[in-house]
């Protein structure tokens, strides 16, 4: 039987004509990739997979309950005969519907739309409905059994958070017009959750690759004699199944132990050979053969391995000393059962019962079958395969010990996976569902069987008990816990008073602009480990850009300061995250391939002697082959056909260990690459003919030779078709022009960095490229915003990725229907004159400003910028700032309305109630400090006084800056409580102290608003909007901004928009000619006049349009904090911090340094002591205890010393006094020792 081979043939590569293909045309390939998957399509696909496959699989397969407990009921004679009761139930149907909420006015449930959830503070959750089958079996002492069965019809258990834009969302597949009608942004992709009215993003989370051995050297610590360890997490399937971890350790004593991380094994370190003996392999030679493969080989590596293994077998272990030399598998299993079976309370009695011994032994083997390497099988007939695989793991660890192979690279994405929201929420759901649903059902049945005789049970009793266990409280537990897992992030949450570690990494979605929203949805977080926060070499390596990042992780975008540097990353522009594929069909196809010998048909000796390569699928060892390279290449060609092998299948040949790996698990990063074909077969054949002709003495032997040609089949016509929308990425994949490559398979590829590099080596047979890349694909969306980023210092590009997310703009098109807290809406946004490919996917967030690079007075130092007053007056960077006020009616005695001063007490003094209409200030009204914006009163219960029926609980506007009421709403909460929701609008023109930034990361602060009459101007009368100091560029090396200004000047004069995407070629000669055509110098500099004196400047000034963005850091928001007074804490008296509490600005460490450098130490003392919580305390010198002082009646008194008291006045702090009170409350006394009195001579 011939192996399956690809059927599609491609035309000769020599005939492909793509000489017209340019670097700019290659950008269309990025557009095709983004249009195919969407920038956040993987996140929605991950959640859809959870809804369609994950939750049903988890509930149906992992929660098949089967428990037996001793019957406690003894009311009747039948009860006394009943020994035990077996409870069995499994869920037969799981369905998660679209979000709904109860309409209390109509008494029914209606569809819950996303904007309704935002405004009403609801959670966008869909009902979870379950159906189950229950079997209750009573076991009697006389051997009789009685069975009761019941079918639980589908009913709602709880609700589950629904992702906006998923297939369970009401906006799924809606047209743009339909989305507008329900108050949604028609261009918004979704991908986030709405929990309690707020928007949250579940981050992509890095994780190690399952079913892979990770070998690491272990740091020698006190009390730890471990040299090296191998960690292996085994997971069958590849997505939502439970996993099991084993740790193989090599100790300084020579022992090799295996630890099975399971609650059933109590983390015992079992000698490795005992695992083999328990599974029936008792001979030492046969056990060692599973590791070394060939005992008869005399190679140095083989000999050294045998020495290590023989020594490890004879190393004494204090725990397993009784069975160290035991060959009887039953005794070994029995010994292990005694160690791990917690219910064996009386071992001596248990050993005398043969049935009990046999039961425990079988039970132990069954547990081992399920938790030891479950990806290799979970039944008894797979034990031999597991032992062979376990021997292979130990073999690889020994190779690392002998320095044959290096340990696992922890930072390489070859051995990593990125888990989306679906996998993260599945982990949280498993733990929460078990605690909040399964446990109450079991307890409910136990209570039913305790109260009701088993023979009297009916199907109705069972259904009612099942439903009662999942009451409203249980439903709220599941719903509340899932919401908490999203809101709290990676922390411990409490479910039914049980702590559960939450593995979901989330962040609040701050809608500053569309770029910020998309970047939040493309964030990849690394697990926060203890090593990450330490100043160690490991912490430094974790943060570096790894060689496996390009094309998958943006090499420029990360946090610029703090612990998140290098730990919080972004996906590259074309990177995508795969869901789990269909493993079974590919496995069957591989096992039926004649080129692959199944594992059971291959002996260990044959692997070594015949040089066979091992074949794996999702980490499962299924067989061997003779030619690994040919097998990998053949299946890659089949993948290009797309009929037998899925296009997203990873096919990797590890030449170091000669293994072929097929991966279809969840979380693989992938990206499309253009395939490079060549004529190597024809070239080799021609060279062979030429060599034969030369050998025969043929003088025309060179005529047989042909040129080696390698090229891509991607052409400029295809690039134009992509831009026209007539060609997609799926079409390119189907035609075999591109394919998806993961970080593993990238190690088998030689990728040309660009089409230019490919053409440079088109006829170079020593550089046979497999693929050609698009240079821009190594960057993420935020980094691609920066024009000519490859000409700018990389650190500045990193700064821009963070500044670009903070810029003002249109954060969404549905802003009129939303009420958001602290959102800035910029009025005027322009498309840059020098755009990049990123602007095809995000709306612009800045303005084309005329910038003059010059020194003009003392107000534009490096970070300072002089702004033209006319630019501000024309609306430059002007916008609206929104705040919200939200008030809830806490009970039925409260109501909205204008308080009547005749029957309401506790009216706020000095407050203005006159603007209220029906409890709210009307839309369009200007409110100032002291105005009541929401009127609310509460009726006093039991009050008989007609003049004091109500108490005022109104909300007063407390900011110094006037605001305009923009919107007023009265939504209903989840329990029909009424909210008062008000949106306030503020004008935010550019002010002195506000920040702005170019797209090259060059940030500046508005230092002076100069009148138009004083601004410099050119000979043509052109005045700059901004004056930037040229000294800010050499040290920052923002060459990209200089190029942008030059190109922008030519574009403005010629009325065109050009592409300044990073890595596009720059023709300096052509740019100079364009400037010369417009009558300018070749470098863009112009002669300018001083606006204050009218004189020429001695030097020509570089002036031109540069795209600037305003950062959302407003001086007006901080003005209230700059004062000598403000609110203080009621307990400590210290000033409050934060905008919400109207607190002050923190006097930080650098501020202390500035004051210290100026010699203003007294100012530091005043600010940190007198203006903080400084106070006077009175202490008795005799006993050191606090004394009593009454200022109104000059009384000094010590409770201990009475009239003998010697009381002194001491400078202190209120926080210190509070601390002393707390210590005394804990029965710890604190006394003060004062310096002795010093009397001055008269």
Swiss-Prot record:
Signal peptide: none annotated. Its main location: host cell. Induction: Expressed in the late phase of the viral replicative cycle. One of its GO terms (molecular function) is ribonucleoside binding. It catalyses: RNA(n) + a ribonucleoside 5'-triphosphate = RNA(n+1) + diphosphate. Pfam families: RNA_pol_Rpb2_1, RNA_pol_Rpb2_2, RNA_pol_Rpb2_3, RNA_pol_Rpb2_4, RNA_pol_Rpb2_6, RNA_pol_Rpb2_7. GO terms for cellular component: DNA-directed RNA polymerase complex; host cell cytoplasm; virion component. InterPro entries: DNA-dir_RNA_pol_su2, DNA-dir_RNAP_su2_dom, DNA-dir_RNAP_su2_hyb_sf, RNA_pol_bsu_CS, RNA_pol_bsu_protrusion, RNA_pol_Rpb2_2, RNA_pol_Rpb2_2_sf, RNA_pol_Rpb2_3. It is found in: Host cytoplasm; Virion. It is an enzyme of class 2 (transferase). Keywords: DNA-directed RNA polymerase, Host cytoplasm, Metal-binding, Nucleotidyltransferase, Transcription, Transferase, Viral transcription, Virion, Zinc, Zinc-finger. Its EC number is 2.7.7.6. It comes from the Viruses. Part of the viral DNA-directed RNA polymerase that consists of 8 polII-like subunits (RPB1, RPB2, RPB3, RPB5, RPB6, RPB7, RPB9, RPB10), a capping enzyme and a termination factor. Belongs to the RNA polymerase beta chain family. PANTHER family: DNA-DIRECTED RNA POLYMERASE I SUBUNIT 2. Catalytic component of the DNA-directed RNA polymerase (RNAP) that catalyzes the transcription in the cytoplasm of viral DNA into RNA using the four ribonucleoside triphosphates as substrates. Forms the polymerase active center together with RPB1. Part of the core element with the central large cleft, the clamp element that moves to open and close the cleft and the jaws that are thought to grab the incoming DNA template. The binding of ribonucleoside triphosphate to the RNA polymerase transcribing complex probably involves a two-step mechanism. The initial binding seems to occur at the entry (E) site and involves a magnesium ion coordinated by three conserved aspartate residues of the two largest RNA Pol subunits. This is DNA-directed RNA polymerase RPB2 homolog. It comes from African swine fever virus (isolate Pig/Kenya/KEN-50/1950) (ASFV).
